[in-house]
Amino acid sequence: SGLYEYLSVTKLEPEDQIDVLDFSLADIMTRGSTTVFEQGWCDEKSIEHMGESGLRTIVGPVASSSNFMTKDGRNVYYNMHEQQAYDRLQYVMDTRQKYDGAYDGRMTVALYLGQVDCCTPEYLDEVRRVMDNDGEMIVTIHAAQSINEYEQIARTYGKTPAGYLYDHGIVGSRVHYGHYLMPQGHSMNAMKLMKPDEELKLIAGTNTNIIHCPWSFGRRGMILESLQHYLDLGINMGIGTDTFTQDIIWEMRYAAIFCKIAEGANPFTGTAAEVFNMATLGGARAIGRPDLGRIQKGCKADIVIVDLNNLDCQPVRDPIKVLVYSACGKNVDKVIVDGKLIVDGNRPVNMDIDKVIGRMQQAQDKMIAKVPERDWAGRSADEMSPMSFRVVD
C-alpha cells in the first residue's frame, strides 16, 4: 500500500530538506492557507526556516515508540525504539521552551506522536503526564487511517484506536486525531468492538478533534462515511491538505463532494458552509485559537483574498459556494498573516518561485534514483508507480 511501501522509499537527501520545505511553504501559502501544522523530524534549522516564512506555524516534532515498515509487501512490521521516544519527547519540551511564541507569536510548538499503532501504553501514559503538566500543548496522532493499523490495535489491546487512546488519556480539546477514516461501521471495517457510534461518540464526548484530509485518501478510493455523520455527532472537524497539491480550497471541495457520495447522493449534506467552517473555525478551535479563523474585532489579521473575477468563478451569487465548488488555489490573489502581506498576485513575496521549483525537481530526481535500494523488493520508481503511458526515447 502507499502508506507502508511508498513512505519508506520517498526519503530526501539531507541537503535537499530546506529546498523542499521552501517549495512546500510556497505551495501552502499561495493556495490560501495562513496557518500550517508541520509534523515530522523538525530540526532547529527547519523550525527557524518556517518561522521566517511569514506563515503562522505549528511545528510538531515526532516522538513515537516505533515506526512501521514492510519486508514483504504483505505484512506490517514495527521497528521499536522506545528510548528514542522518551528522548524525542524531551526534545519537544525543550523546543517548546525555545520557540513556542517566537516570531512575533506566530509559532506554536506541539507534540506529534506519529501513528497510534506506533505508541506503547507505557509511552502514552508518560505523554499524558506531560500533558497534565503543560495544559496548553497541542498533541496530534494519526489514528484509524488504515485497516492494518486498526486490526493491530484490536489484536494487541482489544480496543478500537479511540478506545485505546482514551484509556491512556490522549483525548481532549487540544488533541487531534489525524484522519480517523475507518471506524467501526465503515465499509472497509468489519470489526465490532463497540456498539454502533460508541467509538465516534467517545471522540465527541471528550471534545477531541478530528482532522479530515479528503484528497489524501480519496484519490485511492477511500472516503469518510460520512463527514455529515461526524458533524452531527458533535465532533469538531478541521481540514488538512496532507499531500500535494496543498490546496485548502480543493480540500474543501472534496470534503463536500465525498460527503454527498457517502450519504447516498444527498445534496444537502456536507454543505459549502460546513466545509468552509471546518477550514476556518474548526481548525482554529482545534488549536485553541478563538482569535483565528474569523474576521472580527480582537482577532488576528490573517486574511485570504480570492479573485472571483475570472472564468472559474463567474457568475457569482453565493461567494462561499463559488469558493468551494468552482475556485482553486490559483485564484488566491493575496494572503495576509498577522497584518503582513506574504502572497501578492498568487506569488510569495519573499521567495524566488522559479528557483524553488527548479530545486524541488532536482531533489525529486535524486530521490527517485535511490528508490531501488530502499524498497524491500528492489523495485524502481517506475515499477512501483508506473508511468501513465509508455515513455519513448
Where are these regions (language model features)?
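Alpha-helical scaffold segments that flank or form the walls of functional sites
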Residues: 1-55, 87-104, 361-366
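Divalent metal-coordination and catalytic microenvironments
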Residues: 32, 50, 111, 142, ...
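Metal-coordinating catalytic core of metallo-dependent amide/deamination hydrolases
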Residues: 48-189
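Glycine-enriched alpha-helix->loop->beta-strand junction motifs that scaffold or abut catalytic
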Residues: 54-56, 131-136, 170-173, 202-211, ...
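Histidine/acidic-residue-rich catalytic or RNA/ligand-binding cores of hydrolases
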Residues: 147-159, 185-200, 221-230, 245-261, ...
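His/Asp/Glu-enriched, well-ordered alpha-helical/loop segment
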Residues: 166-174, 225-310, 326-328
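A conserved active-site cap/scaffold subdomain adjacent to cofactor or substrate pockets
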Residues: 182, 188, 204-229, 233-235
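Active-site microenvironment of metallo-dependent hydrolases
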Residues: 277-393
